[in-house]
Amino acid sequence: MPMNEPVDLQPSPSLLPMSRRFRGYLPVVVDVETGGFDWNKHALLEIACVPIEMDAQGHFFPGETASAHLVPAPGLEIDPKSLEITGIVLDHPFRFAKQEKDALDHVFAPVRAAVKKYGCQRAILVGHNAHFDLNFLNAAVARVGHKRNPFHPFSVFDTVTLAGVAYGQTVLARAAQAAGLDWNSADAHSAVYDTEQTARLFCKIANAWPGPASAG
């Protein structure tokens, strides 16, 4: 399914503009692939972002994906077991990895554009185990001294919680399947694939949820 098509065509839960639906925050799905679990010690290796869009009928759908491979930041570690899980080959000739600052610039630009498009104040990170992604993102932002981070520094929407409530599943693959979405295990643990699947899952849940009649 193309990423710019609505996931669900149920009756709209809300006709509030995006700028009011989530208190001025634009949901943006993020997934990172890393060299381990410690954001202060392990390298950020991949990042992907998908802004959540809204059509004229009030349905949420995934926007365009922005992604980057990253050159491991100097002084950070990479656990070989993490590379086994993700399948990342650091010296692959077609990896085209960017330095951290350039990678953040690349993925932040379309996020800021989407925030502006919908008249929102800032982006809020949506992720599966979202604080893992946010902690690695914030660590990279701090390392390079990035001044234009569009994301809220600590608030998130976590699809682990949402999927647990909606489907009784907390593992991304099982939650996606419970939501009626396709899942390809061979593509999992790619930042792009996991982000796009998480975006579809978020939209599926958000479109089915009875949204507020008004919001501040």
UniProtKB/Swiss-Prot annotation:
Sites marked Important for substrate binding and specificity: 37, 132, 154
Superkingdom of source: Bacteria
Enzyme kind, highest EC tier: hydrolase
Transmembrane segments: none
Cofactor details (free text): Binds two Mg(2+) per subunit. The active form of the enzyme binds two Mg(2+) ions in its active site. The first Mg(2+) forms only one salt bridge with the protein.
GO molecular function: 3'-5' exonuclease activity; magnesium ion binding; nucleic acid binding; RNA exonuclease activity, producing 5'-phosphomonoesters
CDD domains assigned to the protein according to its UniProt record, in alphabetical order: RNaseT (cd06134)
Gene Ontology BP terms: DNA replication proofreading; tRNA processing
UniProt keyword annotations, A-Z: Exonuclease, Hydrolase, Magnesium, Metal-binding, Nuclease, tRNA processing
Binding residues for Mg(2+) 1: 31
Keyword Calcium tagged: no
Function: Trims short 3' overhangs of a variety of RNA species, leaving a one or two nucleotide 3' overhang. Responsible for the end-turnover of tRNA: specifically removes the terminal AMP residue from uncharged tRNA (tRNA-C-C-A). Also appears to be involved in tRNA biosynthesis.
HAMAP family to which the protein is assigned, alphabetical: RNase_T
Quaternary data: Homodimer.
Protein name: Ribonuclease T
